[in-house]
From Swiss-Prot:
This protein's name: Nicotinate-nucleotide--dimethylbenzimidazole phosphoribosyltransferase
GO biological process, one term: cobalamin biosynthetic process
Family classification: Belongs to the CobT family.
Xref: HAMAP family: CobT
Recorded catalytic activity of this chain's protein: 5,6-dimethylbenzimidazole + nicotinate beta-D-ribonucleotide = alpha-ribazole 5'-phosphate + nicotinate + H(+)
Organism of this sequence: Porphyromonas gingivalis (strain ATCC BAA-308 / W83)
Length: 345
């Protein structure tokens, strides 16, 4: 797999950031997670005056062979149909990106559809969907490496355009199934606790989904390594997000993590480079079964809990105003001396 150069942020500035935050005209700790965020972002950017520039939400999209087993509420063609809605500006993530000032980047990583030329979508298609991992490996090692590299290159391009904060979204029918497989293998959590309704399965549908995934897990004869698991089960959009997150960390960008699927991508990325988590903020706890358990496993503190289960980066983008507030706090609040206020705690 592509190698990355990721280091934890230098801690030399840590105490100066703490002093700066504690000398703002407020009781120490009274702005809670805003203070934690300001510290984290200051460390990432190595400055007492951090700035957020040109935020991007990157949506990687691809199809999954396991969708042929009826594990999703939606048929496979919904993947490309939703992408068309993104392109038309009418999806949930479109209005959120407009509202919060994000540039939306769409990437075809492996959709089982041929889009006409000239659309505002980046073509990094590795193949038309993954193979059905109920019966065989979803991807080859070479295809996995292509996907990780493609995701990294998309993020590098965003960085070259002045972006220093990035969120990731996804679109791919049946990708909650693949995420459940990643979660169970990479955490050791029982598969039943990792499987949920996805885009809208009823209880019978969830039962069928679990039974299919349980059989797929039993059929897997790999070595159980992170690289083997994410190759065997795919999917292409998730692997691109892994590469994108690792590249963002290498470039010192702030990563806003979305829901169940993107949290699994960060989990996988952290198995290779644990330091990637130093650059990540968890936007929200989603409504997909397994997400809260996964966040707990990763000792994550999500900023929001709104019952979202849309994906697309929606929860990450919704959380952005809180991150902006943290940066505004450290840059705009007066110190006790500037405010001529006696330090009252």
């Amino acid at each position: 797999m592509k190698t990355f150069n990721i280091k934890s942020p230098d801690q030399a500035i840590h105490q100066a950031l703490i002093d700066r935050i504690n000398n703002l005209a407020k009781p120490e700790g009274s702005l809670g997670m805003l203070e934690e965020l300001a510290l984290q972002i200051g460390l990432i950017q190595q400055t007492l005056s951090p700035r957020l520039r040109n935020p991007h939400n990157i949506i990687f999209a691809a199809d999954h062979g396991i969708a042929d087993e009826g594990v999703s509420f939606s048929p496979k063609e919904v993947t490309w149909q939703v992408i068309n809605n993104f392109l038309g500006g009418g999806a949930g993530i479109n209005f959120l990106c407009r509202q919060h000032g994000f540039e939306l980047v769409l990437v075809d990583g492996g959709i089982d559809f041929d889009f006409p030329e000239g659309l505002d979508i980046i073509d990094r298609k590795v193949r038309k969907g993954t193979r059905n991992y109920l019966y065989e490996a979803a991807l080859t090692g070479e295809e996995m490496e292509q996907a990780v590299t493609a995701g990294a290159e998309v993020v590098s391009d965003c960085h070259h355009r002045g972006c220093n904060v990035v969120s990731f979204g996804e679109m791919g029918v049946a990708n909650t199934s693949t995420s459940s497989m990643w979660m169970s293998f990479l955490t050791g959590i029982d598969l039943k606790d990792c499987v949920g309704a996805g885009s809208g399965l009823d209880s019978e549908g969830v039962r069928h989904k679990y039974n299919i995934l349980k059989q797929a897990k039993e059929n897997y004869k790999g070595n159980g390594s992170t690289e083997d698991v994410i190759t065997y089960f795919g999917g292409l959009e998730m692997l691109m997000a892994v590469g994108g997150m690792l590249q963002a960390a290498e470039l010192g960008m702030l990563i806003i993590v979305d829901g169940f699927i993107m949290t699994n991508c960060l989990l996988a990325a952290s198995q290779f480079y644990p330091e990637v988590c130093d650059y990540a903020v968890f936007g929200h706890c989603g409504d997909e079964s397994g997400h809260a358990r996964l966040l707990e496993y990763m000792k994550a503190k999500p900023l929001l809990n709104l019952g979202l289960r849309l994906g697309e980066g929606s929860g990450a983008v919704c959380s952005y105003p809180i991150i902006v507030s943290a940066v505004s706090m450290i840059n705009e609040m007066h110190t006790f001396a500037q405010a001529a206020v006696t330090k009252y705690f």
